[in-house]
């Protein structure tokens, strides 16, 4: 799928204003590495970071830098020696200095309180930046443009820049700075397989005879780079094209059903929820979308209820309670719709052998409620 198509898709996305984007990029794009204070100017550039126990943020910061052409062959210098760090072209997560003009990106000093929002007005994220977030802020647009094969001015770059920060880099910033996801109370379950946790486990254990961290840090850089590129590939090749499908489905919804509350997706399995909420907020339909119908991988039809919120298990309008947990003939008899396959016990999704049957399941559910739900009353994020 060509970049021209993706640009067309992105013209409808709620982007920041041009001035905000230009300001952000002005703040966040440093020059190429300065001249190195070394005799051999042909030597590869040096990226400095601290030695000893390593963390996800500096591993990601170094990995992102080495994806750039000017740092692709860079030497990673792991030390806390100020004299050795002074010889580095760029220093991350050590040194007690944040100075983009000198390519110094530490966040541990008492005076450092910067966030994506404070350094890039117009961006909403207020999590204190780690070295990963600082490198991403200053080099992210350039890096993404290179990886996506487009220019930094392409609106696709700014859109994916935001998605990658919110859904990948910000988590690393928060974990490294000790910022909890919740304000108070005990967590209901443990999260032990996060990216930061997996990087941490690449350090030597306390009782290993060999406490050298160099090999582990190289593995950590490989790990975070692979996951960053996997996530980027998803947003470029799956998330963006899905928006076009959802937009077209919304435009055609009255041809599916006169209520305008049922959306039919041409291709099942695409990530539709986030796009649906965003498009609803832009288009402001008079009634909220209640159901989405689509085919599954087996070619059967699904009718899925739209959640009240993006990550909620509560539906705007669940399938009728008497149908829930039933299958096949038992469901046919209760619903009065032949060819049913199942309805989930919570009522959030059901299946049918045919498109018309799935549509009838949605219509029958709409007919049993008292009145349509105005979009203003539907919880939309």
Swiss-Prot record:
Transit peptide residues according to the UniProt entry: 1-47
Compartment annotation: Nucleus, Nucleoplasm; Mitochondrion matrix; Nucleus, Nucleolus
Protein name: MYG1 exonuclease
Gene: Myg1
GO MF terms, alphabetically ordered: 3'-5'-RNA exonuclease activity
GO biological process: one example: mRNA processing
Function recorded in the entry: 3'-5' RNA exonuclease which cleaves in situ on specific transcripts in both nucleus and mitochondrion. Involved in regulating spatially segregated organellar RNA processing, acts as a coordinator of nucleo-mitochondrial crosstalk. In nucleolus, processes pre-ribosomal RNA involved in ribosome assembly and alters cytoplasmic translation. In mitochondrial matrix, processes 3'-termini of the mito-ribosomal and messenger RNAs and controls translation of mitochondrial proteins.
Organism field: Rattus norvegicus
UniProt EC number: 3.1.-.-
Record's signal peptide: none
Stated family: Belongs to the MYG1 family.
Entry GO CC: cytoplasm; mitochondrial matrix; mitochondrion; nucleolus; nucleoplasm; nucleus
């Amino acid at each position: 799928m060509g970049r021209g198509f993706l640009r067309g898709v992105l013209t409808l996305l709620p982007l920041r204003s041009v001035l905000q984007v230009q300001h952000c990029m002005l703040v966040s794009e440093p020059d190429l590495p300065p001249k190195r204070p070394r005799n051999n100017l042909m030597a590869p550039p040096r990226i400095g970071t601290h030695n000893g126990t390593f963390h996800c943020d500096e591993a990601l910061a170094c990995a992102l830098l080495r994806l750039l052409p000017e740092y692709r062959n860079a030497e990673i210098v792991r030390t806390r020696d100020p004299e050795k760090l002074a010889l580095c072209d760029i220093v991350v997560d050590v040194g007690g200095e944040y100075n983009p003009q000198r390519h110094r990106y530490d966040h541990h000093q008492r005076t450092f309180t910067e966030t994506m929002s404070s350094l890039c007005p117009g961006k909403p994220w207020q999590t204190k930046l780690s070295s990963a977030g600082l490198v991403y802020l200053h080099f992210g647009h350039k890096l993404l443009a290179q990886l996506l094969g487009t220019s930094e001015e392409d609106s696709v770059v700014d859109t994916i820049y935001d998605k990658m920060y919110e859904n990948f880099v910000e988590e690393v910033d928060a974990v490294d700075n000790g910022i909890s996801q919740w304000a108070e109370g005990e967590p209901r379950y443990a999260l032990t397989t996060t990216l930061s946790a997996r990087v941490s486990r690449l350090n030597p254990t306390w009782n290993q005879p060999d406490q050298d961290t160099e090999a582990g840090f190289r593995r950590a850089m490989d790990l975070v780079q692979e996951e960053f590129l996997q996530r980027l590939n998803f947003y470029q090749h799956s998330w963006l094209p899905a928006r076009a499908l959802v937009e077209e489905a919304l435009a055609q919804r009255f041809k599916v059903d006169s209520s305008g509350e049922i959306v039919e997706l041409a291709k099942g399995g695409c990530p539709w929820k986030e796009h649906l909420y965003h498009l609803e907020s832009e288009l402001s339909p008079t009634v909220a979308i209640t159901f989405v119908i689509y085919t599954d991988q087996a070619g059967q039809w699904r009718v899925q209820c739209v959640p009240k919120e993006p990550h909620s298990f509560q539906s705007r309008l669940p399938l009728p309670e008497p149908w829930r947990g039933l299958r096949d003939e038992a469901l046919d008899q209760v619903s009065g719709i032949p060819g049913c396959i199942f309805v989930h016990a919570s009522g959030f999704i059901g299946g049918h052998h045919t498109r018309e049957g799935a549509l009838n399941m949605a219509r029958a559910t709409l007919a049993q409620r008292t009145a349509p739900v105005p979009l203003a009353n539907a919880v939309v994020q």
